[in-house]
Amino acid sequence: MSRALRRALLVSLAFIVVAVAGRARAATADGPLGKVRRTNDRIMGLLRKQARSPAGAKPIDRELTRVVAQFLDFPELARLALGRHWEARSATERQEFSELLRQLIERSYLKQLRSNLNYTVRYLGEKIVGDQAEISTSIEVKRKGRSEALVIQYKMRRGTGGWMVYDVITDDVSVVRNYRSQFNRIIQRQSYNALLEKLRRKLKDPA
C-alpha cells in the first residue's frame, strides 16, 4: 500500500466505517463500539443525501463536521500531538493550536469522504478498561481492482461528551505519534511559531 493511501486512511478511517460484516460483538448502545456505529450511520445517511442532491453539499458538509466534532477528541489529540511542548503553552496558545489542527483534520476528512476508496470493515474486538477503550478492526481496501487488508485500532476515552476517539493506529503507525514526531522536529529545528505558520499555510493551500 502506498504511503499516500495509508495517510489518507489514517485520517478518514478515524471517523467512519463503511460496512460491518459478521455478527455484532456484545456492546451497549452508549459504549465505544456503539458510538462508532451511530456515527457511521449518521455519516452514511448524510453522504447518501449529498449524492442525491450535490447542490446542497455545503449544508451537509457543515453537518458532517459537526458529527465529527462529537466523535473525535480534538483537544486530547492536540495535547498528545504537541507532546512535551504542550505544557509550555498558555491557555490561549493551546486553544489556537487545537483549532488549527482541528481544521486541518476536518478538511482532510471531507476530502477523503469524496474519494473513490472502497472498503469494508470487520470488528475483531472491543476492550474497555475504566475510561479507556480500544476497538480493533480489520479493513479490506479495494482500489483500482486491487484488494489489501489493514488492521486498524481505535483508541477512545470516556469524558463529559461520552466516548471519543483520540488516536488511530494502523500498521503500527499512530496518528498521534506521527504528528508528534513532525511537530517536535519543526519546533526543535525552527520554533513553535514556525510550526503555527506552517499549519496556517497548509490551511490556505487549496490542494
PLM ranges: what are they?
Residues 107-148, 199-207:
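Surface-exposed, charged secondary-structure patches
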Residues 167-207:
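Low-complexity, intrinsically disordered terminal/linker segments enriched in charged
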Residues 149-177:
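Short beta-strand edge/turn micro-motifs at domain boundaries
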Residues 29-109:
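Early exported N-terminus immediately downstream of N-terminal targeting peptides
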Residues 101, 125-127, 139-141, 154-156, ...:
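A mature extracytoplasmic/lumenal domain signature
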